Amino acid sequence: YPSTNIKIDDFKRHLKIIEENKIEFINPKDFENELQNNKLQRKILLTIDDGFLSFYKNAWPILKDKKIPFILFVSTREVGAYNYMTWDQIREISEEDFVEIGNHSHTHEYLADESNKLIKDDIAKSISIFKKKLGKNSDFFSYPFGEYSNNFKIIIKDFGFKYAFGQHSGVIDETKDFYELPRYPINEKYGEFKRFKSLTKTLPFKYKKIYPDEKYLLQANNPPKVKIEFHKDIKNLDAVSCYSNEGNEWRQSNIKFENSTTLFINVAEKFIGERGRINCSLRDPSGLWRWLGIQFVISEK
């Protein structure tokens, strides 16, 4: 699928770009330490969602040969199904000390729309299968479709996960909510080389708080009233620019500062479809770009 796939030649070129820029890969086992240390060094945590067989056949031999660390997120219901990896293949990969097999739910359904009981039952089943097939569950979780609500986040935390990833863009740092960590999606649509090079030159955009705290929007709260409280040490914050896909069309957002560190984003039209997105960027004095992505899940109710 173009939305979840990248051509192998493009993938090889991306790895070469990372190597040429002397950017290191993070071993998932060192993730907690890396968040707190080595903050001046750009590093990449590679994640792969879904566990498709094409990954095992094409990308895995390359990553194994180069010993490039990564997290492979798998949904337990799909393992062994047509075009998906088997548990034997997953176990083979998991034996390498630079690989983490992350939890991606059991069913890979749109769980953010479901009741707490259904979410809990789904995650409990995936954990049970992880323990049976791999001997343990993972500390890492990836929300199906990158969609979450506050309730979903609490459930994931209560099950003992330490980190959970969405699909909103941005750079991770120690100030981020560990249960809504950003990632840059790279696929056939968003894998163009110029874009990829620009992503390797982004920095964390640190903030204290984003409002609304709930990223699952009922129609009564769509469009949301968005406010971001930034940290004081960000230079040239008044030069920030933001874009959103309100009204089903990407456009520059009208923004207003309440004070030197508090930004209001005027989302004038409703978000259409399943997801609403806002991206804010700011050129740093170093020449790199600070990047912050926000994703809302839009309820039909």
Regions flagged by a language model, labelled:
Residues 145, 168, 300:
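Active-site proximal loops enriched in glycine and acidic residues that flank catalytic Cys/His/Asp
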Residues 161-170:
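Acidic, His- and aromatic-enriched active-site or binding-groove loops in soluble protein domains
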